[in-house]
Each structure stands twice: as structure tokens, then as C-alpha cells.
């Protein structure tokens, strides 16, 4: 049985519509539902919250984040 290796592109396709954390180069975190992204890592989030130093600073309905500012994207566990 051979296991297929998952590429970063595969991972990103799988998490569309799920809660994510987007960490920027500046250290700011955006948490929300991943609406879409492109090959340049430009990201559209829904139900977005902005965290600075771990503290909630703002809430946005929709947010667009330019890809060159993104340090990483990770999945976020759903809140109960």
C-alpha cells in the first residue's frame, strides 16, 4: 500500500470553508473562515477577527490579506 504525499497546494484546497489562523510577518493574527485564496497566497476570510499580541483588537465581516504579508496559514479547531 503506497501513501500519496500531500502537497501544500492539496492542504490549502482541503481547508477552504474551514476556520483558519493566518499569521502575518508583522506578528498579527487573523482568524476566520477561509473563503478563497490564489497562487500568490492572497487570502479572503469571512467572520474575521484580528489579534495583536494575543488580544482581540477588531472584528470584520470579510477581509482580504495580500499574500506577500503572510507568514503561514494553519487550521483552527472549531469553537464550541
From Swiss-Prot:
One GO MF term: RNA binding
Any Pfam family the entry gives: LSM
SMART domains for this protein: Sm
Entry-linked SUPFAM superfamilies: Sm-like ribonucleoproteins
GO BP term, example: mRNA catabolic process
Subcellular location: Cytoplasm; Nucleus
Annotated Sm domain residues: 7-79
Signal peptide: none
Residue(s) carrying N6-acetyllysine: 59
GO CC terms, sorted: cytoplasm; cytosol; Lsm2-8 complex; nucleolus; nucleoplasm; nucleus; P-body; small nuclear ribonucleoprotein complex
UniProtKB keywords: Acetylation, Cytoplasm, mRNA processing, mRNA splicing, Nucleus, Ribonucleoprotein, RNA-binding, rRNA processing, Spliceosome, tRNA processing
Assembly information from the UniProt record: Component of the precatalytic spliceosome (spliceosome B complex). Component of the U4/U6-U5 tri-snRNP complex, a building block of the precatalytic spliceosome (spliceosome B complex). The U4/U6-U5 tri-snRNP complex is composed of the U4, U6 and U5 snRNAs and at least PRPF3, PRPF4, PRPF6, PRPF8, PRPF31, SNRNP200, TXNL4A, SNRNP40, SNRPB, SNRPD1, SNRPD2, SNRPD3, SNRPE, SNRPF, SNRPG, DDX23, CD2BP2, PPIH, SNU13, EFTUD2, SART1 and USP39, plus LSM2, LSM3, LSM4, LSM5, LSM6, LSM7 and LSM8.
Assigned protein family: Belongs to the snRNP Sm proteins family. SmF/LSm6 subfamily.
Function: Plays a role in pre-mRNA splicing as component of the U4/U6-U5 tri-snRNP complex that is involved in spliceosome assembly, and as component of the precatalytic spliceosome (spliceosome B complex). The heptameric LSM2-8 complex binds specifically to the 3'-terminal U-tract of U6 snRNA. Component of LSm protein complexes, which are involved in RNA processing and may function in a chaperone-like manner, facilitating the efficient association of RNA processing factors with their substrates.
Protein name (Swiss-Prot/TrEMBL): U6 snRNA-associated Sm-like protein LSm6
Source organism: Homo sapiens
Amino acid at each position: 500500500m503506497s501513501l500519496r504525499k500531500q502537497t501544500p497546494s492539496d492542504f490549502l484546497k482541503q481547508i477552504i470553508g474551514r476556520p483558519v489562523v493566518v499569521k502575518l510577518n508583522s506578528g498579527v493574527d487573523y482568524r476566520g473562515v477561509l473563503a478563497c485564496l490564489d497562487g500568490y497566497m492572497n487570502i479572503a476570510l469571512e467572520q474575521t477577527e484580528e489579534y495583536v499580541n494575543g488580544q482581540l483588537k477588531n472584528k470584520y465581516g470579510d477581509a482580504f490579506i495580500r499574500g506577500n504579508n503572510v507568514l503561514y496559514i494553519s487550521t483552527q479547531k472549531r469553537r464550541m
